[in-house]
């Protein structure tokens, strides 16, 4: 924790400096590689961690080494992870998917924005200083056409996005030759289908079945295709966004870039303060990962924060505004029904979802059914025209472990399953949001209920937190639950930062939350038996046993922290080649002792073998050549 707290002015200046001086940056001893596909423009980025050779013998003067293979890993950092790419936040990222979108011939450019709010913002000269300078003319599906990845998948079409994803999900493991690295324990997948090699056809089939989604708005061509589904790698979402009391556009762009650097597969912009529209434009134009939002937050701002004044018209305008900016998925709290609200009365913590509480208040004040539920088909029509995926929000999720798995929570979940089928009628991609606060013994039921009642649509959970006693450490309490539910089949985990329940996270909090959740997701992949998931672990274990300290740092999820902790006690360069660390010292290092035992055992075996052969030679009379029948 920093000893001195920066002022708001200093925070903004620091963020501005960050984005002004931003360059493509690789992690230590890593390089960006690209694997090309068969379709035009399919060039999939990965990070390759270079390793040092292993000393296997020889003398001090002429040591003998064995090379260690470079380890390819999944990379979410986009152009920010490639030192060869010039970064200019003012111009935004290259439009990777634009040629693919144009080639399909099913979209048209809009001459006029569909949202009245967008028109008003564009006409306001006072916003010129804040507005993103680049111009993206939004697109929409042509009349009678659907432009969703689900629609294409159901038509049997393998899109470039699907091939891109297949290559990405395989993580370059076909490049690994070492049997030591390829070894993997069998997993327990709880019914998940995990093929040894992920093909573009497998991706298409999973999307067509609704078991996976590709969040890829046609107006966010900068994004690199990724997939969310239980038969793929477990993904992690990071939340950013300003509030009425803190954060600025510069800081949110900084947090976006920072999130992708530390492994965010998607980012949700949960801004509730000023300049939501302008902040989101900057984020989208500079994001290589899908961006999600909760549209009800902005709709509420449009009616001055008064939930009772919300209308379908204001909400619809917000959907159009955000869809034409390029938002890839909407969280919609359409399952908070009027009849479910009384079920929360006996809860210890009531309704803790912001979106859920807004809709519950609206329902009670008007004594009408949730207008998101009533207009759900119209929501689907909008999403189908831009390929916005739906993340059906759990507005009645439990906010304490006492309220876990109650009547209200599962009533809403069953309604989300009904809405899923409606969305699929419009070829709209769907995932389901889940809790929340759930003790460990009650977590698996959440997954089984979701699979049964939501027809295997991908599950996306916030944690869940497994205990309520650790404010300041809720990235730990929730990381435990996240690892478990990821193993049981959850497709994406929404990170929790140390600031959960306490305040708006800063840059360091974002990193802490992401590292915690990348650990949880990876642990789940190992437990499920995802092919190739253990390669990096094996490489780390080999480097650890061989005292290749630099390789240990570089293979870590956070190389900088690993190195810093090591160097606190052994900062000298000699510490990087020492066969011990400060934990045990040179005489008590178990791995050093194990190496000595192994070397001793191997030597003794050889010597014993020579002695046995010598005795056998003498017993046979010392003859160099034996008759055939004696041999």
UniProtKB/Swiss-Prot annotation:
This protein's UniProt keywords: 4Fe-4S, Iron, Iron-sulfur, Lyase, Metal-binding, S-adenosyl-L-methionine, Thiamine biosynthesis, Zinc
Class of this enzyme: lyase
Highest taxon of the lineage: Bacteria
Record GO terms (molecular function): 4 iron, 4 sulfur cluster binding; carbon-carbon lyase activity; zinc ion binding
Catalytic activity: 5-amino-1-(5-phospho-beta-D-ribosyl)imidazole + S-adenosyl-L-methionine = 4-amino-2-methyl-5-(phosphooxymethyl)pyrimidine + CO + 5'-deoxyadenosine + formate + L-methionine + 3 H(+)
Pathway the protein takes part in: Cofactor biosynthesis; thiamine diphosphate biosynthesis
The EC number(s) this enzyme carries: 4.1.99.17
Positions that bind [4Fe-4S] cluster: 581, 584, 589
Entry annotated with the keyword Iron: yes
Positions that bind substrate: 239, 268, 297, 333, 353-355, 394-397, 433, 460
Cofactor: [4Fe-4S] cluster
Ligand binding (Zn(2+)): 437, 501
Role, per record: Catalyzes the synthesis of the hydroxymethylpyrimidine phosphate (HMP-P) moiety of thiamine from aminoimidazole ribotide (AIR) in a radical S-adenosyl-L-methionine (SAM)-dependent reaction.
Quaternary organization: Homodimer.
Family label: Belongs to the ThiC family.
Cross-referenced NCBIfam families: PRK09284.1 (NF006763), PRK13352.1 (NF009895), thiC (TIGR00190)
Name used for this protein in its record: Phosphomethylpyrimidine synthase
Encoding gene (name): thiC
């Amino acid at each position: 924790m920093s000893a001195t707290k920066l002022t708001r002015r200093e925070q903004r200046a620091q963020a501005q400096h960050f984005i002004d001086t931003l360059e493509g940056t690789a992690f230590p001893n890593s390089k960006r590689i690209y694997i090309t596909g068969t379709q035009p423009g399919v060039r999939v980025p990965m990070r390759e961690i270079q390793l040092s050779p292993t000393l296997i013998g020889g003398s001090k003067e002429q040591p003998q080494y064995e090379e260690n293979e470079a380890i390819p890993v999944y990379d979410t950092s986009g152009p920010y992870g490639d030192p060869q790419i010039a970064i200019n936040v003012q111009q935004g990222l290259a439009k990777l998917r634009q040629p693919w979108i144009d080639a399909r011939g099913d979209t048209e450019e809009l001459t006029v924005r569909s949202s009245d709010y967008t028109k008003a913002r564009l006409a306001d000269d006072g916003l010129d200083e804040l507005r993103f300078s680049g111009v993206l003319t939004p697109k929409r599906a042509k009349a009678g056409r659907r432009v969703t990845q689900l629609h294409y998948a159901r038509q049997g079409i393998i899109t470039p996005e699907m091939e891109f994803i297949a290559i990405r999900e395989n993580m370059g493991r076909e490049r690994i030759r070492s049997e030591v690295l390829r070894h993997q324990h069998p997993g327990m997948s709880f019914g998940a289908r995990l093929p040894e090699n992920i093909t573009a056809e497998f991706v298409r089939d999973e999307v067509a079945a609704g078991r996976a989604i590709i969040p890829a708005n046609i107006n966010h061509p900068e994004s690199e295709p990724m997939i969310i589904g239980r038969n793929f790698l477990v993904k992690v979402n990071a939340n950013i966004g300003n509030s009425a009391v803190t954060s600025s556009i510069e800081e949110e762009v900084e947090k976006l870039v920072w999130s992708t650097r530390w492994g965010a597969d998607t980012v949700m912009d949960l801004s509730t303060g000023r300049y939501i529209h302008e902040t989101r434009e900057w984020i989208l134009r500079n994001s290589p990962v899908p961006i999600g939002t909760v549209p009800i937050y902005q709709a509420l701002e449009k009616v001055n924060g008064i939930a009772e004044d919300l209308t379908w018209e204001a909400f619809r305008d917000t959907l159009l505004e955000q869809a034409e900016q390029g938002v890839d998925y909407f969280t919609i709290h359409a399952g908070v029904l009027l009849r479910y609200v009384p079920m929360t009365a006996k809860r210890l913590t009531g309704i803790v979802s912001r979106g859920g509480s807004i809709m519950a208040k609206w329902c009670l004040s008007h004594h009408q059914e949730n207008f998101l539920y009533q207009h759900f088909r119209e929501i689907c029509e909008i999403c189908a025209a831009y390929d916005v995926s739906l993340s059906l929000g759990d507005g009645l999720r439990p906010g304490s472990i006492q309220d876990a798995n109650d009547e209200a929570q599962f009533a809403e979940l069953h309604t989300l399953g009904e809405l899923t089928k409606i969305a699929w009628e419009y070829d709209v991609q769907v995932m389901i949001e889940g809790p929340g606060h759930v003790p460990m013994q009650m977590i698996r039921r959440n997954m089984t209920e979701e699979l049964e009642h939501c027809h295997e649509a991908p599950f996306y959970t916030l944690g869940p937190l497994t205990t309520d006693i650790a404010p300041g450490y809720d990235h730990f309490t929730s990381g435990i639950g996240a690892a478990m539910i990821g193993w049981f089949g959850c497709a994406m985990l929404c990170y929790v930062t140390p600031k959960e329940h306490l305040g708006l996270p800063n840059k360091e909090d974002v990193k802490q939350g992401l590292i915690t959740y990348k650990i949880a997701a990876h642990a789940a992949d190992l437990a499920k038996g995802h092919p190739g998931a253990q390669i990096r672990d094996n490489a780390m274990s080999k480097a650890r046993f061989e005292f290749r300290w630099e390789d240990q740092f570089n293979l870590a999820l956070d190389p900088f922290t690993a190195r810093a902790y090591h160097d606190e006690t052994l900062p000298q360069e000699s510490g990087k080649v020492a066969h011990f660390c400060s934990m045990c010292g040179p005489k008590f290092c178990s791995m050093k002792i194990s190496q000595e035992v192994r070397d001793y055992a191997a030597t003794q075996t050889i010597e014993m073998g020579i002695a046995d052969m010598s005795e056998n030679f003498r017993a046979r009379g010392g003859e160099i050549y034996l008759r055939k029948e004696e041999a």
